[in-house]
C-alpha cells in the first residue's frame, strides 16, 4: 500500500513538471446524509489536481485532496473521532460552453483515521467558471465502505494556476 501511494505521488509531481495546462487548488464544504448523517455534522476538504486539455471541450487529469468529517457532539456521550479520507482519483470534465462544465472523479479513498479502511471513491461534479481561472462547483461525494457509504453534498471553489513550459 505504501509503495502504491509513493508511486502515485511521484507520478503526480513528475507529471506536473512537464505539464502545460493547469494545477487545480480548491476547498469545499459538505453536508453528509444517509449512513453518516447521525454521526457527522458537516465535513470540509481541500482538493489538489492537474488537468490537461484533451480537446476543445474535454479535460482529463488526476485529483487528490483531504476530506475531514466533523463528528456530532452529544451531551454526556462518548466523543466520536473525525472521519478522514485521502482520495486519489482520475478526473474528467466536459465543457459544453465556455463557463459550464460537468464530469467526475473516480478512484480510491484511503481512510486516515483509526478503523477506517477507505473504499471506492466517486464524485460527479457540475461547475461554473466565473472569471478566467476560478470555478464554483456543486458535487456529490460517495465512498463505498464495508457495510456503509460515505455520502455528502458539496459546494466548493476551485482555482486554476496556469503552468506554461519555459522556452529555451
Residue ranges and their predicted role:
Residues 19-61, 150-168:
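Short glycine/proline- and aromatic-enriched beta-strand/turn motifs that initiate or cap beta-hairpins
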Residues 24, 70, 117-168:
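Predominantly the C-terminal beta-signal and adjacent terminal strand-loop region
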Residues 25-29, 60-64, 90-92, 102-104, ...:
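Membrane-embedded beta-strand positions of outer-membrane beta-barrel proteins
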Residues 29-35, 52, 64-72, 106-112, ...:
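Transmembrane beta-strands of outer-membrane beta-barrel pores
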Residues 95-119:
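Mid-chain, well-packed structural core segment of small domains
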Amino acid at each position: 500500500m505504501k509503495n502504491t501511494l509513493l508511486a502515485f505521488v511521484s507520478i503526480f509531481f513528475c507529471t506536473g513538471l512537464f505539464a502545460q495546462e493547469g494545477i487545480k487548488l480548491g476547498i469545499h464544504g459538505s453536508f453528509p446524509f444517509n449512513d453518516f448523517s447521525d454521526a457527522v455534522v458537516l465535513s470540509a476538504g481541500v482538493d489538489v489536481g492537474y488537468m490537461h486539455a484533451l480537446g476543445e471541450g474535454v479535460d482529463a487529469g488526476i485529483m487528490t485532496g483531504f476530506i475531514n468529517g466533523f463528528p456530532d457532539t452529544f451531551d454526556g456521550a462518548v466523543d466520536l473521532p473525525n472521519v478522514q479520507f485521502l482520495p486519489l482519483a482520475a478526473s474528467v470534465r466536459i465543457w459544453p460552453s465556455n463557463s459550464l462544465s460537468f464530469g467526475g472523479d473516480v478512484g480510491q479513498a484511503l481512510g486516515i483515521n483509526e478503523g477506517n479502511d477507505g473504499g471506492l471513491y466517486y464524485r460527479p461534479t457540475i461547475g461554473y467558471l466565473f472569471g478566467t481561472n476560478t470555478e464554483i462547483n456543486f458535487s456529490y461525494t460517495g465512498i463505498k465502505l464495508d457495510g456503509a457509504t460515505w455520502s455528502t453534498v458539496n459546494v466548493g471553489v476551485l482555482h486554476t494556476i496556469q503552468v506554461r513550459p519555459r522556452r529555451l
